[in-house]
């Protein structure tokens, strides 16, 4: 027996296996194409996450510096009062690449910008600290979105590679072996029928 479930006997089996091989070849082609696209996307998200991490690190250091300045000039109470005034809002836009959903856009609602009225109330160092923390928060969320996209694409890339190997290393060879056995069996049957007709 050939080990391929559902295969009809005889010439119909040869046709059936030929169709299955064509499907397997097309599946391997599509999976290979998906691997190439996902690999490019993974490289792109790797670069984006590295850049966003550097931006986040720089922005966090800047925010820390302004926090220290604001605390020294206006005290912790002024810093807390300024941050409670306008909470930030966040929205994520999603995109699908080759069947993989991942964060694509980060939208912000910071509330009103620090103005001269707040500068008079809290002091310019506090207003600068609040603005620096907004930038750092935005950079952190952008980095988190880039990392989430990278993880989603990398996970799908690994699954797709596994599927491609299953098709090319197991499914196609099994079908080719079965087709070779069917052809050999049909040739033997035709020879036996030819010998029987000659007698």
Spell out what each predicted region is.
Residues 1-199:
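Charge-rich amphipathic alpha-helical interaction elements
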